[in-house]
Amino acid sequence: MSTIEERVKKIVSEQLGVKEEEITNASSFVDDLGADSLDTVELVMALEEEFETEIPDEEAEKITTVQEAIDYVVSHQ
């Protein structure tokens, strides 16, 4: 089984069309990886599906980097 970090990076790569090697934990979805608002919504939906959780909108707005996504998943499993 892949680690949460690996799974999050794979989702980010697939959703944003970025190579996994280019993604760091500090990568900002918008500033570093070129995501727009629709991309971030789709990214949150993909995270919800992968980790079988629901991320409330007010929490989703706070998830702006790869590390924040990892931290959210870890704390809500």
Curated annotation (Swiss-Prot):
Residues with the O-(pantetheine 4'-phosphoryl)serine modification: 37
Keyword terms, alphabetized: Cytoplasm, Fatty acid biosynthesis, Fatty acid metabolism, Lipid biosynthesis, Lipid metabolism, Phosphopantetheine, Phosphoprotein
InterPro entries associated with the record: ACP (IPR003231), ACP-like_sf (IPR036736), PP-bd_ACP (IPR009081), Ppantetheine_attach_site (IPR006162)
Protein name: Acyl carrier protein
Record keyword Iron-sulfur present: no
GO cellular component terms listed in the entry, alphabetical order: cytosol; membrane
Pfam families: PP-binding
Protein's organism: Oceanospirillum linum
Family matches, as PANTHER family: ACYL CARRIER PROTEIN, CARRIER DOMAIN-CONTAINING PROTEIN
Job description of the protein: Carrier of the growing fatty acid chain in fatty acid biosynthesis.
Family, per entry: Belongs to the acyl carrier protein (ACP) family.
Claim: Kinase is one of the keywords in the record: no
Primary localisation category: cytoplasm
Modification(s) after translation: 4'-phosphopantetheine is transferred from CoA to a specific serine of apo-ACP by AcpS. This modification is essential for activity because fatty acids are bound in thioester linkage to the sulfhydryl of the prosthetic group.
